[in-house]
UniProtKB/Swiss-Prot annotation:
Highest taxon listed in the record's lineage: Eukaryota
Coiled-coil segments: none
The keyword Repressor belongs to this UniProt entry's keyword annotation: no
Compartments where located: Secreted
Family per similarity comment: Belongs to the DEFL family.
Annotated protein name in UniProt: Putative defensin-like protein 101
Annotated signal sequence range: 1-27
An example Gene Ontology biological process: defense response to fungus
A single GO cellular-component term on record: extracellular region
Keywords: Antimicrobial, Disulfide bond, Fungicide, Plant defense, Secreted, Signal
Length: 84
């Protein structure tokens, strides 16, 4: 019983911070929205790091992209490609 309890506790201590990190660190408020060429769609809730950058690079935006909250676009972050 003790070993099961310890394993479950360890999983919770390790798993929840990882999920929380990936869910919250991917998007931020965009202060200068003029750098974005266009937003290509919403960022997945549990996207891997650099998901948006890779999507923009595959669409020939050489500066990449980032997940950002855009004014007037609702409460979900958008994948916006950078126009430099």
């Amino acid at each position: 019983m003790d070993i099961t309890k310890n394993i479950v506790t360890l999983l919770l201590v390790v798993l929840f911070p990882i999920l929380f990190y990936y869910n919250n660190v991917l998007a931020f408020p965009a202060s200068d929205q003029s750098i974005y060429a266009r937003c290509i769609g919403p960022c997945p809730r549990y996207a891997v790091p650099h998901w948006c950058e890779n999507e923009c690079l595959s669409r020939k935006y050489m500066a990449g992209g980032e997940c950002a909250f855009i004014e007037g676009e609702g409460p979900t972050p958008r994948c916006c490609c950078i126009n430099l």
